[in-house]
Curated annotation (Swiss-Prot):
Functional note: Peptide chain release factor 1 directs the termination of translation in response to the peptide chain termination codons UAG and UAA.
SUPFAM superfamilies for this protein: Release factor (SSF75620)
Family per record: Belongs to the prokaryotic/mitochondrial release factor family.
Stretches the record annotates as Disordered: 285-305
Species, as recorded: Proteus mirabilis (strain HI4320)
Cystine bridges: none
GO MF terms, alphabetically ordered: translation release factor activity, codon specific
Record PTM text: Methylated by PrmC. Methylation increases the termination efficiency of RF1.
InterPro entries cross-referenced by the UniProt entry: PCRF, Pep_chain_release_fac_I, Pep_chain_release_fac_I_sf, Prokaryotic/Mito_RF, RF-1
Gene3D superfamilies (alphabetical): 3.30.160.20, 3.30.70.1660, 6.10.140.1950
Name this protein carries in UniProt: Peptide chain release factor 1
């Protein structure tokens, strides 16, 4: 491993031990804010320092095994031990490289999940409903909570559009790779000839960042319309104009919210989604400028940015970004998404490592 990387790891180990001592001090314990901040930093350093300590022990083991190679009686055993230690060393070095990758500060946040029916009419709306159910099951398995912000139901079921907040530690970091175009190939229930139809939906995943980090939105840049709620969930309020539509004039971004009885609550929810969308657009623009020559596994949430195909007749799901095909569609639709998400995360980390080695 490069001396510069070892020096960095040594500095992190020292900081970890320093925080450990600070957390036992009375004045730190007395300050809730400082104690919370240090506890968070301590938790963030735990994995990498634990891995680094294991790596240091393996260096000692390899050194001891190499010294025994000169002893004829111990040589065979030493060779075995050295081979085993070298294998462990290789694994630990890979883990340390991944743990040293720059973290996206947004990864720890809750997120907004937006699903929109695209081409395919009623079938696309039904598929949007299937996708929402899939993500809901996945969230449930991870002990996350889903809070629907706005739902525009399809005429024959499903959704033309649904926006939900996913509440749970690291929700954005896990789901952010789901942004993009999702295509479905299946025989609709109304299809008498048994022909396969192709429909599409778009998914956008945005971090719910703290208010202080949201872009400043001038009230003069907003057009706010009220209207009567409609559809499921809206019947109990459709005698008053409690639903809200906010248009951000400079960007043309429009957000609707009609899920609450109170106009005030609907407006607050709509503003939080609007802030997240404006910030996401700014971040994406910056990332595109910085990495125009490098592929981006993070989908844009744009219809043309097709990331995945779900083929029901063949029970197949394909992720086009990494050419991954699984014949486990039933499991995926029941929310077992890790088999799709983990390979993308691994590939993303490999891209980051490649970019870092290019810099070196």
């Amino acid at each position: 491993m490069k001396p510069s990387i070892v020096a960095k790891l040594e500095a992190l180990q020292e900081r970890y031990e320093e925080i450990q001592a600070l957390l036992a001090e009375a004045d730190v314990i007395a300050s809730q804010e400082r104690f919370r901040a240090l506890s968070k930093e301590y938790a963030q350093l735990t994995d990498i320092t634990s891995c680094y300590r294991q790596w240091r022990k393996v260096q000692d083991d390899m050194e001891a095994a190499e010294m025994m190679l000169d002893d004829p009686e111990m040589k065979e055993m030493a060779q075995e031990e050295l081979k085993e230690a070298q294998s462990v060393n290789e694994e630990l070095e890979q883990q340390l490289q991944v743990l040293l990758l720059p973290k996206d500060p947004d990864d720890e946040f809750n997120c907004f999940l937006e699903i929109r029916a695209g081409t395919g009419g009623d079938e696309a709306a039904l598929f949007a409903g299937d996708l929402f159910r899939m993500y809901s099951r996945y969230a449930e398995a991870r002990r996350w909570r889903i809070e629907v912000m706005n739902a525009n139901e399809g005429e024959h079921g499903g959704y033309k559009e649904i926006i939900a907040k996913v509440i749970g530690d690291g929700a954005y970091g896990v789901l952010k790779f789901e942004s993009g175009g999702h295509r479905v190939q299946r025989v609709p229930e109304t299809e008498s000839q048994g022909r396969i139809h192709t429909s599409a939906c778009t998914v956008a995943v945005l971090p719910e960042v703290p208010e202080a980090e949201l872009p400043e939105i001038s009230p003069s840049d907003l057009r706010i319309d009220t209207f009567r709620s409609s559809g499921a969930g809206g019947q109990h309020v459709n005698t008053t104009d409690s639903a809200i539509r906010i248009t951000h004039i400079p960007t043309g971004i429009v957000v609707e919210c009609q899920d609450e009885r109170s106009q005030h609550k609907n407006k607050a929810k709509a503003m939080s989604v609007l802030g997240a969308r404006i910030r996401a657009a700014e971040v994406q623009k910056r990332q595109e400028a910085e990495a125009s020559e490098r592929r981006n596994l993070l989908g844009s949430g744009d219809r043309s940015d097709r990331i995945r195909t779900y083929n029901f007749p063949q029970g197949r799901v394909t992720d086009h970004r990494i050419n991954l095909t699984l014949y486990r569609l039933d499991e995926v639709m029941e929310g077992k998404l890790d088999a799709l998400i983990q390979p993308i995360v691994t590939e993303y980390q490999a891209d980051q490592l490649s970019a870092l080695s290019e810099q070196d």
